[in-house]
Amino acid sequence: MIEENLKQKIHDKFVAAKKNGHLKVTHAESKKLKDPQTTTQYWVTFAPSLALKPDANKNSDSKAEDPFANPDEELVVTEDLNGDGEYKLLLNKFPVVPEHSLLVTSEFKDQRSALTPSDLMTAYNVLCSLQGDKDDDVTCERYLVFYNCGPHSGSSQDHKHLQIMQMPEKFIPFQDVLCNGKDHFLPTFNAEPLQDDKVSFAHFVLPLPESSDQVDEDLLAMCYVSLMQRALTFFQDWTNESPELTKSYNVLLTKKWICVVPRSHAKSGPPLMLNINSTGYCGMILVKDREKLENLTEDPHLVDKSLLQCGFPNTAGQKPTEYHY
């Protein structure tokens, strides 16, 4: 059971840690762009100071220390989120978005492992605790949970963790539009997960029940497994041709929907060369130099091209047996 007043506890811990220098908020400026070809909204954040940090996705010869094994006490929101000893909640030490939090397994588990029903339910309960019953896309504070799984997903730590952050005000990810007016369902051969046929990259989305009372571990697990079945088909031929490559994917979860995106690369190719994690696949893009920001402002469709470079081609309208790579 998620403890009461979690939102206030995160806020208080964040304010104290920032004041005492235990975390540093990355200075950034953001702007909303719209892709004229796909009509997709993008929230582009410019954070030049991040260009000075080493690339966390680059492998090093020595095994990196686990930052979640003995975290700074000033960053620990709670040592036992559920009261069952499974999870702790930490603050991100270098957030771009204030109060960016990490849902971390108490014992070490591999970031390449699948999400469990408990992982999914705990993440959903955190969303409910932070967001309450408010569901107005425009006026309420909305939160996103995301999971970067595998080396091509944008993951930078080996210890299993999901991330929680507030979504930008008045920002509408394409998954919202895709699920608008649609009831919850589980896929069958005749009812595939939702895909937006206007964007170029493969993604699989299911709307969740409007009432949180109808959401339980079994439902979330069935949604996740059905989406993963579609996503994993992309790796069948790929791994046969290049067996050294590891399966990677992103999971995005809001109170309204769950989305899985298969990944082929962590970084896009020219012209942008962007490091992209889960947040990119709901339209939130981070850039570190002004030239790229200007390129995106001039041609927002470059985002869609970059997302395809890091993923696989859209298969909207195809059955799983018809997917091609």
Curated annotation (Swiss-Prot):
Enumerate the InterPro entries for this protein. Ap4A_phos1/2, Ap4A_phos1/2-like, Ap4A_phos1/2_N, ATP_adenylylTrfase_C, Fork-head_TF_regulator, HIT-like_sf
Q: Where in the cell is it found?
A: Cytoplasm; Nucleus
One Pfam family, short name: ATP_transf
Q: Binding positions for substrate?
A: K53, N92, K93, N148, G154, S155, S156, Q157, Q163, N277, S278, T279, M284, K288
Give the molecular function GO annotations: ATP binding; ATP:ADP adenylyltransferase activity; bis(5'-nucleosyl)-tetraphosphatase activity; sulfate adenylyltransferase (ADP) activity
In this protein, the active site sits at H161
Q: How does activity depend on pH?
A: Optimum pH is 7.5.
Q: Which cofactor does it need?
A: a divalent metal cation
Functional description taken from the UniProt entry: Ap4A phosphorylase catalyzes the phosphorolytic degradation of bis(5'-adenosyl) tetraphosphate (Ap4A) into ADP and ATP. Can also use other Np4N' nucleotides (where N and N' stand for A,C,G or U) as substrates, but prefers A-containing substrates. Cannot catalyze the reverse reaction. Additionally, this enzyme can also catalyze the phosphorolytic degradation of adenosine 5'-phosphosulfate (AMPS) into ADP and sulfate, the reversible exchange reaction between inorganic phosphate and the beta-phosphate of a nucleoside diphosphate (NDP), and the synthesis of Ap4A from AMPS plus ATP.
Misc. remarks from the entry? Present with 1770 molecules/cell in log phase SD medium.
UniProt-recorded name of the protein: Diadenosine 5',5'''-P1,P4-tetraphosphate phosphorylase 2
The organism is: Saccharomyces cerevisiae (strain ATCC 204508 / S288c) (Baker's yeast)
Gene name tied to this protein:
APA2
